Amino acid sequence: YIFAGWTIYAAMKHPYFSNPMIYLPLILLGIDKIYKKQKPYVFIWSVALAGLSNFYFFYMLGIFMVLYAIFRYFDLFADRSIKNIGKWLGVFAVYSVIAVLIAAVILLPVILPVFGTDRFKAENYVPLFYDRIYYEKYLGCLIGENMIQWGVAGYTAVSLAGVFVLFSKKKKYTALKAGFVLLNVFLLLPYAGHVLNGLSYVSNRWIWAYGMLIAYIFVKIYPELFALTLTEKRKVFVMLLIYCILALLPEAARTQRNLMAMVLLSLSTFTVLSFGNIFTRERNLTVMVAGFLIAGILFNMHYQYSYEKDYLSEFTDSGEALEKLETGVDRAVLSTDDPSVYRYDQMDTNSSENSSMQMGTNSTAYYFSVASSSIANFFDEMYLNTPWEQHYNNLDGRTILDRLASVKYFVVKKGKESDLPYGYFRLSGEAEKNGKTYLAYADEDALPLGYTYDSWISREDYDKMTVTEKQQALLQGVVLDDSSLPETETHFNDREVSYYTSEGKGCRLKNGKVVVTQENAQLKLVFEGEENAETYLITEGLDYEGLSPREMISDKKWSKMTTYEQNKLL
Protein backbone atom coordinates (compact mmCIF):
# COMPACT_ATOMS: atom_id res chain seq x y z
CA TYR A 1 0.00 0.00 0.00
CA ILE A 2 2.74 2.43 1.00
CA PHE A 3 4.93 1.67 -2.02
CA ALA A 4 2.26 1.51 -4.73
CA GLY A 5 2.61 3.59 -7.88
CA TRP A 6 0.66 6.48 -6.38
CA THR A 7 3.36 7.09 -3.77
CA ILE A 8 6.24 6.50 -6.16
CA TYR A 9 4.86 8.95 -8.73
CA ALA A 10 2.21 11.32 -7.36
CA ALA A 11 3.25 11.73 -3.73
CA MET A 12 6.78 12.59 -4.83
CA LYS A 13 5.45 15.33 -7.12
CA HIS A 14 2.87 16.63 -4.62
CA PRO A 15 3.66 15.44 -1.06
CA TYR A 16 0.18 16.29 0.21
CA PHE A 17 -1.20 13.75 -2.28
CA SER A 18 -0.12 11.15 0.28
CA ASN A 19 -2.51 12.58 2.90
CA PRO A 20 -5.56 10.52 1.85
CA MET A 21 -3.43 7.37 2.08
CA ILE A 22 -2.79 8.22 5.74
CA TYR A 23 -6.41 8.92 6.67
CA LEU A 24 -8.17 6.15 4.72
CA PRO A 25 -7.03 3.20 6.89
CA LEU A 26 -7.84 5.17 10.05
CA ILE A 27 -11.34 6.00 8.80
CA LEU A 28 -11.98 2.37 7.82
CA LEU A 29 -10.74 1.26 11.25
CA GLY A 30 -13.11 3.76 12.83
CA ILE A 31 -16.04 2.34 10.84
CA ASP A 32 -15.21 -1.18 12.05
CA LYS A 33 -15.05 0.04 15.65
CA ILE A 34 -18.48 1.63 15.34
CA TYR A 35 -19.94 -1.59 13.91
CA LYS A 36 -18.43 -3.40 16.94
CA LYS A 37 -20.18 -0.82 19.16
CA GLN A 38 -16.89 0.57 20.44
CA LYS A 39 -16.04 4.24 21.02
CA PRO A 40 -16.35 6.37 17.85
CA TYR A 41 -13.32 8.54 18.59
CA VAL A 42 -11.07 7.01 15.92
CA PHE A 43 -13.74 7.60 13.25
CA ILE A 44 -14.61 11.14 14.33
CA TRP A 45 -11.04 12.40 14.64
CA SER A 46 -9.87 10.66 11.46
CA VAL A 47 -12.67 12.26 9.45
CA ALA A 48 -12.05 15.62 11.12
CA LEU A 49 -8.32 15.51 10.36
CA ALA A 50 -9.05 14.54 6.75
CA GLY A 51 -11.38 17.54 6.45
CA LEU A 52 -8.79 19.87 7.97
CA SER A 53 -6.09 18.50 5.70
CA ASN A 54 -7.48 18.92 2.19
CA PHE A 55 -11.02 19.43 0.92
CA TYR A 56 -10.26 17.80 -2.46
CA PHE A 57 -9.26 14.41 -1.09
CA PHE A 58 -11.79 14.74 1.74
CA TYR A 59 -14.49 14.55 -0.92
CA MET A 60 -13.04 11.30 -2.28
CA LEU A 61 -12.55 9.89 1.20
CA GLY A 62 -16.22 10.57 1.91
CA ILE A 63 -17.29 8.52 -1.10
CA PHE A 64 -15.07 5.54 -0.23
CA MET A 65 -16.07 5.82 3.41
CA VAL A 66 -19.71 5.36 2.43
CA LEU A 67 -18.91 2.51 0.04
CA TYR A 68 -16.87 0.69 2.68
CA ALA A 69 -19.60 1.13 5.31
CA ILE A 70 -22.18 -0.34 2.90
CA PHE A 71 -20.04 -3.32 1.90
CA ARG A 72 -19.02 -3.94 5.50
CA TYR A 73 -22.61 -3.82 6.73
CA PHE A 74 -23.79 -6.51 4.32
CA ASP A 75 -20.70 -8.55 5.16
CA LEU A 76 -21.26 -8.41 8.94
CA PHE A 77 -25.01 -8.36 9.55
CA ALA A 78 -27.73 -10.80 8.62
CA ASP A 79 -30.45 -8.33 9.63
CA ARG A 80 -30.89 -6.19 6.52
CA SER A 81 -34.23 -4.65 7.37
CA ILE A 82 -34.97 -1.01 6.62
CA LYS A 83 -35.18 -0.36 10.36
CA ASN A 84 -31.70 -1.70 11.08
CA ILE A 85 -30.16 0.01 8.05
CA GLY A 86 -31.80 3.27 9.11
CA LYS A 87 -30.44 2.90 12.64
CA TRP A 88 -26.84 2.51 11.44
CA LEU A 89 -27.31 5.27 8.90
CA GLY A 90 -28.35 7.61 11.70
CA VAL A 91 -25.37 6.61 13.85
CA PHE A 92 -22.87 7.32 11.08
CA ALA A 93 -24.65 10.55 10.13
CA VAL A 94 -24.35 11.92 13.68
CA TYR A 95 -20.67 11.02 14.01
CA SER A 96 -19.91 12.39 10.53
CA VAL A 97 -21.62 15.71 11.30
CA ILE A 98 -19.59 16.02 14.51
CA ALA A 99 -16.38 15.39 12.55
CA VAL A 100 -17.29 17.93 9.85
CA LEU A 101 -18.15 20.55 12.49
CA ILE A 102 -14.73 20.05 14.06
CA ALA A 103 -13.09 20.51 10.65
CA ALA A 104 -15.36 23.40 9.65
CA VAL A 105 -13.02 26.06 11.04
CA ILE A 106 -10.71 25.42 8.07
CA LEU A 107 -12.91 23.35 5.75
CA LEU A 108 -15.62 25.98 5.21
CA PRO A 109 -13.35 28.97 4.38
CA VAL A 110 -11.58 26.77 1.83
CA ILE A 111 -14.56 25.02 0.28
CA LEU A 112 -16.94 27.98 -0.07
CA PRO A 113 -14.83 29.80 -2.70
CA VAL A 114 -14.57 26.57 -4.67
CA PHE A 115 -18.27 26.57 -5.51
CA GLY A 116 -17.91 30.03 -7.06
CA THR A 117 -14.99 29.20 -9.34
CA ASP A 118 -15.44 28.75 -13.06
CA ARG A 119 -13.30 25.64 -12.72
CA PHE A 120 -16.00 24.08 -10.52
CA LYS A 121 -18.94 25.36 -12.57
CA ALA A 122 -17.44 24.50 -15.96
CA GLU A 123 -19.29 21.99 -18.12
CA ASN A 124 -16.60 19.40 -18.74
CA TYR A 125 -16.80 16.98 -21.63
CA VAL A 126 -17.01 13.43 -20.31
CA PRO A 127 -16.78 10.70 -22.99
CA LEU A 128 -18.67 7.45 -22.57
CA PHE A 129 -15.43 5.48 -22.92
CA TYR A 130 -11.69 6.15 -23.02
CA ASP A 131 -9.68 5.79 -26.22
CA ARG A 132 -9.09 2.25 -27.39
CA ILE A 133 -5.42 2.29 -26.44
CA TYR A 134 -6.40 2.84 -22.79
CA TYR A 135 -8.25 -0.47 -22.70
CA GLU A 136 -5.54 -2.23 -24.69
CA LYS A 137 -2.96 -1.31 -22.06
CA TYR A 138 -5.25 -1.47 -19.02
CA LEU A 139 -4.44 -4.93 -17.63
CA GLY A 140 -0.71 -4.51 -18.06
CA CYS A 141 -0.82 -1.08 -16.45
CA LEU A 142 -2.14 -2.49 -13.16
CA ILE A 143 1.36 -3.81 -12.39
CA GLY A 144 3.36 -2.10 -15.13
CA GLU A 145 3.13 1.19 -17.02
CA ASN A 146 1.33 4.28 -15.71
CA MET A 147 -2.19 4.83 -17.06
CA ILE A 148 -3.42 8.15 -18.38
CA GLN A 149 -5.61 10.50 -16.30
CA TRP A 150 -3.47 9.99 -13.17
CA GLY A 151 -4.25 6.27 -13.16
CA VAL A 152 -0.95 5.42 -11.50
CA ALA A 153 -1.56 1.90 -10.19
CA GLY A 154 1.93 0.39 -10.02
CA TYR A 155 0.99 -2.52 -7.76
CA THR A 156 3.50 -5.27 -7.10
CA ALA A 157 3.10 -8.46 -9.11
CA VAL A 158 2.75 -10.60 -5.99
CA SER A 159 -0.32 -8.59 -4.92
CA LEU A 160 -2.07 -9.56 -8.15
CA ALA A 161 -1.26 -13.20 -7.39
CA GLY A 162 -3.26 -12.63 -4.21
CA VAL A 163 -6.21 -11.46 -6.32
CA PHE A 164 -6.05 -14.71 -8.32
CA VAL A 165 -6.18 -16.68 -5.07
CA LEU A 166 -9.11 -14.55 -3.90
CA PHE A 167 -11.21 -15.46 -6.93
CA SER A 168 -10.22 -19.12 -6.68
CA LYS A 169 -12.08 -19.30 -3.36
CA LYS A 170 -15.67 -20.34 -3.87
CA LYS A 171 -18.39 -18.72 -1.75
CA LYS A 172 -15.88 -16.76 0.32
CA TYR A 173 -14.76 -13.12 0.48
CA THR A 174 -17.81 -11.94 -1.46
CA ALA A 175 -17.44 -8.33 -0.28
CA LEU A 176 -13.79 -8.17 -1.37
CA LYS A 177 -14.61 -9.66 -4.75
CA ALA A 178 -17.44 -7.17 -5.27
CA GLY A 179 -15.21 -4.28 -4.18
CA PHE A 180 -12.47 -5.35 -6.59
CA VAL A 181 -14.91 -5.56 -9.49
CA LEU A 182 -16.48 -2.20 -8.60
CA LEU A 183 -13.19 -0.29 -8.47
CA ASN A 184 -12.11 -1.80 -11.78
CA VAL A 185 -15.39 -0.60 -13.28
CA PHE A 186 -14.56 2.86 -11.90
CA LEU A 187 -11.22 2.76 -13.71
CA LEU A 188 -12.80 1.61 -16.96
CA LEU A 189 -15.48 4.32 -17.16
CA PRO A 190 -14.56 8.01 -17.60
CA TYR A 191 -17.75 9.09 -15.82
CA ALA A 192 -16.49 7.52 -12.59
CA GLY A 193 -13.31 9.59 -12.87
CA HIS A 194 -15.51 12.64 -13.46
CA VAL A 195 -17.63 12.04 -10.34
CA LEU A 196 -14.72 11.12 -8.08
CA ASN A 197 -12.85 14.23 -9.23
CA GLY A 198 -15.55 16.49 -7.86
CA LEU A 199 -17.67 16.52 -11.05
CA SER A 200 -14.76 18.23 -12.78
CA TYR A 201 -12.61 16.95 -15.64
CA VAL A 202 -11.95 13.20 -15.85
CA SER A 203 -9.16 12.14 -13.50
CA ASN A 204 -8.40 8.96 -11.58
CA ARG A 205 -6.62 10.62 -8.68
CA TRP A 206 -8.62 8.34 -6.40
CA ILE A 207 -6.51 5.32 -7.37
CA TRP A 208 -4.76 5.34 -3.98
CA ALA A 209 -8.01 3.86 -2.61
CA TYR A 210 -7.72 1.00 -5.09
CA GLY A 211 -4.22 0.44 -3.71
CA MET A 212 -5.70 0.08 -0.22
CA LEU A 213 -8.11 -2.56 -1.49
CA ILE A 214 -5.34 -4.49 -3.26
CA ALA A 215 -3.19 -4.43 -0.11
CA TYR A 216 -6.13 -5.45 2.09
CA ILE A 217 -6.99 -8.32 -0.26
CA PHE A 218 -3.44 -9.64 -0.07
CA VAL A 219 -3.36 -9.44 3.74
CA LYS A 220 -6.68 -11.31 4.00
CA ILE A 221 -5.62 -13.91 1.44
CA TYR A 222 -2.10 -14.44 2.79
CA PRO A 223 -3.06 -17.31 5.18
CA GLU A 224 -4.87 -19.00 2.27
CA LEU A 225 -1.58 -19.26 0.34
CA PHE A 226 -0.56 -22.09 2.65
CA ALA A 227 -3.77 -24.10 2.21
CA LEU A 228 -4.64 -24.09 -1.50
CA THR A 229 -6.33 -27.21 -2.84
CA LEU A 230 -5.38 -28.74 -6.17
CA THR A 231 -8.59 -27.40 -7.74
CA GLU A 232 -7.87 -23.90 -6.48
CA LYS A 233 -4.31 -24.06 -7.80
CA ARG A 234 -5.63 -25.00 -11.22
CA LYS A 235 -8.00 -22.02 -11.13
CA VAL A 236 -5.13 -19.70 -10.19
CA PHE A 237 -2.99 -21.05 -13.03
CA VAL A 238 -5.81 -20.55 -15.56
CA MET A 239 -6.38 -16.97 -14.31
CA LEU A 240 -2.65 -16.25 -14.62
CA LEU A 241 -2.64 -17.62 -18.16
CA ILE A 242 -5.71 -15.61 -19.22
CA TYR A 243 -4.40 -12.42 -17.60
CA CYS A 244 -0.96 -12.60 -19.24
CA ILE A 245 -2.43 -13.36 -22.68
CA LEU A 246 -4.98 -10.53 -22.50
CA ALA A 247 -2.47 -8.08 -21.01
CA LEU A 248 0.15 -8.67 -23.71
CA LEU A 249 -2.13 -9.39 -26.67
CA PRO A 250 -2.32 -5.74 -27.86
CA GLU A 251 0.94 -4.66 -29.45
CA ALA A 252 0.81 -1.31 -27.68
CA ALA A 253 0.97 -3.07 -24.30
CA ARG A 254 4.16 -5.00 -25.04
CA THR A 255 6.54 -2.55 -23.43
CA GLN A 256 9.66 -3.58 -21.56
CA ARG A 257 8.14 -2.54 -18.24
CA ASN A 258 4.96 -4.55 -18.80
CA LEU A 259 6.89 -7.61 -19.97
CA MET A 260 9.10 -7.55 -16.88
CA ALA A 261 6.01 -7.15 -14.69
CA MET A 262 4.50 -10.28 -16.28
CA VAL A 263 7.70 -12.20 -15.58
CA LEU A 264 7.57 -11.20 -11.91
CA LEU A 265 3.86 -12.07 -11.74
CA SER A 266 4.45 -15.50 -13.26
CA LEU A 267 7.37 -16.27 -10.93
CA SER A 268 5.49 -15.17 -7.80
CA THR A 269 2.35 -17.10 -8.81
CA PHE A 270 4.31 -20.28 -9.61
CA THR A 271 6.03 -19.95 -6.22
CA VAL A 272 2.64 -19.89 -4.49
CA LEU A 273 1.43 -22.84 -6.56
CA SER A 274 4.59 -24.82 -5.78
CA PHE A 275 3.98 -24.80 -2.05
CA GLY A 276 3.03 -28.27 -0.87
CA ASN A 277 4.59 -29.95 -3.90
CA ILE A 278 8.11 -28.71 -4.59
CA PHE A 279 8.64 -27.37 -1.04
CA THR A 280 6.58 -27.71 2.14
CA ARG A 281 8.14 -25.43 4.75
CA GLU A 282 5.93 -22.38 5.39
CA ARG A 283 8.99 -20.29 6.19
CA ASN A 284 10.31 -20.80 2.67
CA LEU A 285 7.08 -19.52 1.12
CA THR A 286 7.04 -16.56 3.52
CA VAL A 287 10.60 -15.57 2.58
CA MET A 288 9.95 -15.98 -1.15
CA VAL A 289 6.70 -13.97 -1.08
CA ALA A 290 8.48 -11.21 0.85
CA GLY A 291 11.29 -11.33 -1.71
CA PHE A 292 8.90 -10.96 -4.63
CA LEU A 293 7.12 -8.12 -2.82
CA ILE A 294 10.39 -6.21 -2.37
CA ALA A 295 11.47 -7.04 -5.92
CA GLY A 296 8.17 -5.66 -7.27
CA ILE A 297 8.60 -2.42 -5.33
CA LEU A 298 12.19 -1.96 -6.51
CA PHE A 299 11.14 -2.83 -10.06
CA ASN A 300 8.46 -0.13 -10.10
CA MET A 301 10.83 2.43 -8.59
CA HIS A 302 13.56 1.59 -11.09
CA TYR A 303 11.32 2.14 -14.10
CA GLN A 304 9.63 5.24 -12.69
CA TYR A 305 12.96 6.92 -11.99
CA SER A 306 14.89 5.49 -14.93
CA TYR A 307 16.89 7.75 -17.25
CA GLU A 308 14.61 6.79 -20.13
CA LYS A 309 11.46 7.89 -18.30
CA ASP A 310 13.33 11.00 -17.14
CA TYR A 311 10.83 11.66 -14.34
CA LEU A 312 13.54 13.11 -12.09
CA SER A 313 14.15 15.95 -14.56
CA GLU A 314 10.83 17.48 -13.43
CA PHE A 315 12.27 18.10 -9.97
CA THR A 316 14.76 20.59 -8.57
CA ASP A 317 18.14 19.24 -7.50
CA SER A 318 18.70 18.77 -3.79
CA GLY A 319 19.71 22.00 -2.06
CA GLU A 320 18.50 24.25 -4.88
CA ALA A 321 14.78 24.62 -4.12
CA LEU A 322 15.15 27.57 -1.74
CA GLU A 323 17.57 29.25 -4.12
CA LYS A 324 14.99 28.98 -6.92
CA LEU A 325 12.24 30.44 -4.74
CA GLU A 326 14.39 33.44 -3.83
CA THR A 327 14.05 34.98 -7.27
CA GLY A 328 16.00 37.94 -8.59
CA VAL A 329 12.66 39.67 -9.20
CA ASP A 330 11.69 39.59 -5.52
CA ARG A 331 15.19 40.60 -4.47
CA ALA A 332 15.05 43.63 -6.76
CA VAL A 333 11.73 44.69 -5.24
CA LEU A 334 12.99 44.18 -1.68
CA SER A 335 16.09 46.24 -2.46
CA THR A 336 13.84 49.34 -2.71
CA ASP A 337 13.47 49.22 1.10
CA ASP A 338 9.91 50.45 0.68
CA PRO A 339 7.96 49.86 3.95
CA SER A 340 4.54 50.56 2.41
CA VAL A 341 2.05 47.93 1.22
CA TYR A 342 2.10 47.52 -2.55
CA ARG A 343 2.18 45.03 -5.41
CA TYR A 344 4.76 44.51 -8.12
CA ASP A 345 4.43 43.26 -11.69
CA GLN A 346 7.01 41.86 -14.11
CA MET A 347 7.49 40.84 -17.71
CA ASP A 348 9.55 37.91 -19.08
CA THR A 349 11.72 37.49 -15.99
CA ASN A 350 11.12 33.73 -15.58
CA SER A 351 10.07 34.29 -11.98
CA SER A 352 8.61 31.40 -9.97
CA GLU A 353 4.90 31.43 -9.22
CA ASN A 354 4.12 32.03 -5.54
CA SER A 355 7.71 33.04 -4.78
CA SER A 356 6.15 36.03 -3.01
CA MET A 357 4.95 33.70 -0.25
CA GLN A 358 8.57 32.83 0.50
CA MET A 359 10.01 36.30 0.03
CA GLY A 360 7.32 38.33 1.79
CA THR A 361 6.39 40.42 -1.25
CA ASN A 362 3.09 40.93 -3.10
CA SER A 363 3.03 40.17 -6.81
CA THR A 364 0.42 39.84 -9.54
CA ALA A 365 1.29 36.15 -10.06
CA TYR A 366 -0.78 33.31 -8.62
CA TYR A 367 -0.92 29.52 -8.77
CA PHE A 368 -3.26 27.59 -6.49
CA SER A 369 -6.12 25.17 -7.05
CA VAL A 370 -8.66 27.49 -5.42
CA ALA A 371 -9.07 30.78 -7.26
CA SER A 372 -11.60 33.59 -6.97
CA SER A 373 -14.17 33.57 -9.76
CA SER A 374 -14.37 37.37 -9.53
CA ILE A 375 -10.73 37.68 -10.57
CA ALA A 376 -11.27 35.17 -13.37
CA ASN A 377 -14.30 37.14 -14.63
CA PHE A 378 -12.30 40.37 -14.49
CA PHE A 379 -9.50 38.78 -16.53
CA ASP A 380 -12.05 37.60 -19.10
CA GLU A 381 -13.48 41.11 -19.38
CA MET A 382 -9.99 42.53 -19.85
CA TYR A 383 -9.05 39.88 -22.45
CA LEU A 384 -6.09 38.76 -20.37
CA ASN A 385 -4.58 35.65 -21.90
CA THR A 386 -4.73 33.34 -18.86
CA PRO A 387 -5.70 29.83 -20.00
CA TRP A 388 -6.16 28.71 -16.36
CA GLU A 389 -8.17 30.81 -13.95
CA GLN A 390 -6.05 29.45 -11.08
CA HIS A 391 -2.70 30.23 -12.71
CA TYR A 392 -1.53 33.61 -13.98
CA ASN A 393 1.80 35.44 -14.11
CA ASN A 394 1.23 39.15 -14.73
CA LEU A 395 -1.19 41.80 -15.98
CA ASP A 396 0.12 41.82 -19.53
CA GLY A 397 2.26 44.90 -18.97
CA ARG A 398 -0.79 47.19 -19.21
CA THR A 399 -0.46 50.46 -17.33
CA ILE A 400 -4.17 50.78 -16.55
CA LEU A 401 -4.46 47.27 -15.11
CA ASP A 402 -1.34 47.82 -13.02
CA ARG A 403 -2.84 51.04 -11.64
CA LEU A 404 -6.11 49.30 -10.77
CA ALA A 405 -4.17 46.51 -9.02
CA SER A 406 -2.10 48.96 -6.94
CA VAL A 407 1.15 47.99 -8.66
CA LYS A 408 3.98 50.29 -7.57
CA TYR A 409 7.01 48.53 -9.06
CA PHE A 410 7.61 46.83 -12.38
CA VAL A 411 10.58 44.48 -12.78
CA VAL A 412 12.44 43.72 -16.01
CA LYS A 413 15.79 42.20 -16.88
CA LYS A 414 18.61 44.60 -17.63
CA GLY A 415 18.61 45.31 -21.35
CA LYS A 416 14.84 44.72 -21.56
CA GLU A 417 13.79 48.19 -20.41
CA SER A 418 11.64 48.44 -23.55
CA ASP A 419 9.21 46.05 -21.81
CA LEU A 420 8.41 48.70 -19.19
CA PRO A 421 4.81 50.00 -19.38
CA TYR A 422 4.09 53.71 -19.40
CA GLY A 423 4.66 55.45 -16.06
CA TYR A 424 7.59 53.44 -14.70
CA PHE A 425 10.42 55.94 -15.07
CA ARG A 426 12.46 55.88 -11.84
CA LEU A 427 14.89 53.03 -11.12
CA SER A 428 14.35 52.18 -7.45
CA GLY A 429 15.81 48.71 -6.93
CA GLU A 430 18.33 46.35 -8.44
CA ALA A 431 19.42 42.76 -7.79
CA GLU A 432 21.68 40.24 -9.46
CA LYS A 433 21.21 36.50 -9.62
CA ASN A 434 22.83 33.81 -11.75
CA GLY A 435 24.62 36.42 -13.83
CA LYS A 436 21.42 38.34 -14.65
CA THR A 437 20.49 41.78 -13.37
CA TYR A 438 16.89 42.59 -12.42
CA LEU A 439 15.69 46.19 -12.32
CA ALA A 440 12.70 47.46 -10.32
CA TYR A 441 11.18 50.68 -11.68
CA ALA A 442 8.69 52.73 -9.66
CA ASP A 443 5.42 54.32 -10.77
CA GLU A 444 5.09 57.72 -9.12
CA ASP A 445 1.33 57.71 -9.68
CA ALA A 446 0.62 54.24 -8.26
CA LEU A 447 -2.65 53.85 -6.41
CA PRO A 448 -2.60 52.62 -2.80
CA LEU A 449 -3.83 49.13 -1.96
CA GLY A 450 -7.20 50.62 -1.00
CA TYR A 451 -8.87 53.45 -2.89
CA THR A 452 -12.40 54.82 -3.46
CA TYR A 453 -14.52 56.22 -6.32
CA ASP A 454 -16.78 59.27 -6.29
CA SER A 455 -18.96 58.21 -9.26
CA TRP A 456 -20.39 55.01 -10.71
CA ILE A 457 -21.03 53.22 -14.02
CA SER A 458 -24.03 50.96 -14.48
CA ARG A 459 -23.35 47.31 -15.22
CA GLU A 460 -25.58 47.60 -18.31
CA ASP A 461 -23.50 50.43 -19.78
CA TYR A 462 -20.25 48.72 -18.84
CA ASP A 463 -21.18 45.46 -20.58
CA LYS A 464 -21.79 47.36 -23.84
CA MET A 465 -18.24 48.75 -23.90
CA THR A 466 -15.32 47.33 -25.83
CA VAL A 467 -12.43 45.87 -23.86
CA THR A 468 -10.29 48.98 -24.34
CA GLU A 469 -13.18 51.17 -23.17
CA LYS A 470 -13.81 48.96 -20.14
CA GLN A 471 -10.30 49.30 -18.75
CA GLN A 472 -10.39 53.08 -19.27
CA ALA A 473 -13.81 53.27 -17.63
CA LEU A 474 -12.56 51.50 -14.49
CA LEU A 475 -10.10 54.34 -13.93
CA GLN A 476 -13.01 56.79 -13.91
CA GLY A 477 -15.82 55.09 -12.00
CA VAL A 478 -16.83 51.96 -10.12
CA VAL A 479 -19.17 49.47 -11.83
CA LEU A 480 -22.35 48.83 -9.80
CA ASP A 481 -25.88 47.63 -10.41
CA ASP A 482 -27.23 50.69 -8.62
CA SER A 483 -25.91 53.58 -6.53
CA SER A 484 -26.77 56.99 -5.11
CA LEU A 485 -23.43 58.36 -6.34
CA PRO A 486 -23.28 60.62 -9.42
CA GLU A 487 -22.96 58.75 -12.70
CA THR A 488 -19.54 58.81 -14.34
CA GLU A 489 -19.06 60.83 -17.50
CA THR A 490 -16.69 58.47 -19.27
CA HIS A 491 -14.04 59.68 -21.72
CA PHE A 492 -12.11 57.37 -24.05
CA ASN A 493 -9.03 58.02 -26.17
CA ASP A 494 -8.47 54.64 -27.81
CA ARG A 495 -8.69 54.16 -31.56
CA GLU A 496 -8.30 51.39 -34.10
CA VAL A 497 -5.40 51.57 -36.53
CA SER A 498 -5.53 50.30 -40.09
CA TYR A 499 -3.47 47.24 -40.98
CA TYR A 500 -3.05 44.59 -43.62
CA THR A 501 -2.01 40.94 -43.40
CA SER A 502 1.02 39.41 -45.02
CA GLU A 503 1.63 35.71 -45.34
CA GLY A 504 4.58 34.58 -43.29
CA LYS A 505 6.56 31.41 -42.85
CA GLY A 506 4.49 28.24 -42.54
CA CYS A 507 1.00 29.63 -43.23
CA ARG A 508 -1.17 31.04 -45.98
CA LEU A 509 -4.48 32.88 -46.31
CA LYS A 510 -7.32 31.14 -48.13
CA ASN A 511 -11.03 32.04 -48.26
CA GLY A 512 -10.89 34.09 -45.08
CA LYS A 513 -9.02 31.37 -43.20
CA VAL A 514 -5.47 31.09 -41.92
CA VAL A 515 -4.11 27.73 -43.07
CA VAL A 516 -1.14 26.61 -40.96
CA THR A 517 1.18 24.09 -42.60
CA GLN A 518 4.00 23.76 -40.06
CA GLU A 519 4.91 24.47 -36.44
CA ASN A 520 5.91 27.99 -35.33
CA ALA A 521 4.15 29.50 -38.34
CA GLN A 522 3.98 33.28 -38.66
CA LEU A 523 1.30 35.61 -39.99
CA LYS A 524 2.39 39.23 -40.31
CA LEU A 525 0.12 42.16 -39.46
CA VAL A 526 1.53 45.38 -40.89
CA PHE A 527 0.42 48.71 -39.35
CA GLU A 528 1.58 52.21 -38.43
CA GLY A 529 2.13 52.37 -34.66
CA GLU A 530 1.11 55.31 -32.46
CA GLU A 531 3.68 57.17 -30.41
CA ASN A 532 3.30 57.24 -26.60
CA ALA A 533 0.61 54.60 -26.68
CA GLU A 534 0.01 50.97 -25.79
CA THR A 535 -0.77 48.83 -28.82
CA TYR A 536 -3.13 45.87 -28.40
CA LEU A 537 -3.78 43.01 -30.77
CA ILE A 538 -7.30 41.69 -30.18
CA THR A 539 -8.40 38.54 -31.99
CA GLU A 540 -12.07 37.56 -32.05
CA GLY A 541 -13.70 34.58 -33.71
CA LEU A 542 -10.38 32.79 -34.14
CA ASP A 543 -11.50 29.16 -33.78
CA TYR A 544 -9.65 26.02 -34.74
CA GLU A 545 -9.76 22.29 -34.18
CA GLY A 546 -6.92 20.60 -32.37
CA LEU A 547 -4.54 18.43 -34.35
CA SER A 548 -3.35 15.12 -32.93
CA PRO A 549 0.36 14.20 -33.23
CA ARG A 550 -0.64 11.28 -35.49
CA GLU A 551 -2.15 13.66 -38.07
CA MET A 552 1.19 15.44 -38.40
CA ILE A 553 2.83 12.30 -39.81
CA SER A 554 2.14 10.71 -43.18
CA ASP A 555 0.94 7.10 -43.38
CA LYS A 556 4.16 6.16 -45.16
CA LYS A 557 6.36 7.55 -42.40
CA TRP A 558 4.07 6.09 -39.72
CA SER A 559 4.40 2.59 -41.14
CA LYS A 560 8.19 2.82 -40.91
CA MET A 561 8.17 3.82 -37.24
CA THR A 562 8.70 1.21 -34.52
CA THR A 563 5.93 0.47 -32.04
CA TYR A 564 7.98 2.20 -29.36
CA GLU A 565 8.26 5.36 -31.49
CA GLN A 566 4.52 5.30 -32.22
CA ASN A 567 3.61 4.84 -28.54
CA LYS A 568 5.99 7.60 -27.50
CA LEU A 569 4.37 9.99 -29.97
CA LEU A 570 0.84 9.13 -28.83
Q: What kind of region is each of these model predictions?
A:
Residues 1-76, 88-111, 116, 186-187, ...:
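Membrane-embedded helix bundles of polyisoprenyl
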Residues 2-28, 35, 51-61, 145-159, ...:
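Membrane-interface micro-motifs in multi-pass membrane enzymes
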Residues 19, 58-68, 120, 126-130, ...:
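Aromatic- and carboxylate-enriched substrate-binding clefts and catalytic-loop regions
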Residues 23-29, 60-71, 99, 103, ...:
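Hydrophobic cores of alpha-helical transmembrane segments in multi-pass inner/ER membrane proteins
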Residues 38, 57, 175-191, 197-324:
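Contiguous transmembrane helix-bundle modules in multi-pass membrane proteins
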Residues 76-89, 229-235:
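Membrane-interfacial, low-structure loops and terminal tails that flank and connect transmembrane helices
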Residues 288-570:
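Soluble catalytic regions of membrane-associated enzymes that act on cell-envelope
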